[in-house]
């Protein structure tokens, strides 16, 4: 008789019997409800599948994918420079961080990280810190709206407008800028930008003080946020959670300090931390981060020395200062003369045409670059096969990773606490689904 070589498993019994027995012993009915994807208190098109035992959440699952746009796949059919117009639309509240992470990865592949002009790096840092401020204000505004505090919502969006006005002045758009490019930035700061930023530095501390008055000692806000959605350092590290959630649990991990990029090692700032590990602690960390961002921006203005804002290699860098003709159509003669060079070379114009239409070629290889976005570690993994287009680009979006913590934060709490928990994560579904 031949001994069976396969392993046979009895499908009955084991853990499943325990689950059935527990359900039979339960005196209450379990209710499964869908919160979202079109619920007024969820961030974007996020679907939460909650199992309730009365008011208590016994199981929380996250349903994503409702905002899938195929950005990563589409980038495989565009040039490396055109990729910035795609990545800026992922997490649409932090577009400049998306662009920077992508461009840092491309610059690593090209081997030009150290050739990016100093002025371009200072502008990148300043724009990112302004973006951090605007993102945190949206986080607090939407959180207030979801808890019914409409004054917090209106104030948060009002403060954000100050930042968006600067973005519009510099890039021409309030969102989806495509301003940061491989090798530098699209163009220099327009006249009046420094004065506009200094106005923000003067006014913003007063606005922050008003926001603190609304929330810091508000008994209703404290009741809804303290000891709610608790997640300690161990839980954060096990789930890969980064950003304000991790720092609110007591670990001062910030890529700007741990793995500096764009010259962050030359700036003086602190990493706000808390040991509360709850919703209230995350709010306090975000408020403190806004203050540190203002400190960094002030240093940026002092470091803004005259100079180029795009790498000088003509095979990579586009002309950084575009100008329209007097009729409002086409490029100005001065701009075309700049492209063609002093001798009016037709070859230079042809090269420029090929650079814009075909793009530059990137040597074969792989590179990963990460930045500290307002939500956490935002990483870009880029693969080149030596062509003018990416072979593969993949992003580690912090909202996607941090949403894994929903179950740990919500199970055992109440339905009302689910709203506070998700809002404290501050996910943006454009970055989650991509």
UniProtKB/Swiss-Prot annotation:
Segments traversing the membrane: none
GO cellular component: a single term: plasma membrane
Domain of life: Bacteria
GO molecular function, one term: quinone binding
Membrane topology: Peripheral membrane protein
EC main group: translocase
UniProt keywords, alphabetically: Cell membrane, Membrane, NAD, Quinone, Translocase, Transport
Keyword Transport annotated: yes
Primary subcellular site in the record, as a coarse category: membrane
Record Pfam families: Complex1_49kDa
Reaction catalysed by this enzyme: a quinone + NADH + 5 H(+)(in) = a quinol + NAD(+) + 4 H(+)(out)
Similarity comment: Belongs to the complex I 49 kDa subunit family.
Function: NDH-1 shuttles electrons from NADH, via FMN and iron-sulfur (Fe-S) centers, to quinones in the respiratory chain. The immediate electron acceptor for the enzyme in this species is believed to be a menaquinone. Couples the redox reaction to proton translocation (for every two electrons transferred, four hydrogen ions are translocated across the cytoplasmic membrane), and thus conserves the redox energy in a proton gradient.
This protein's name: NADH-quinone oxidoreductase subunit D
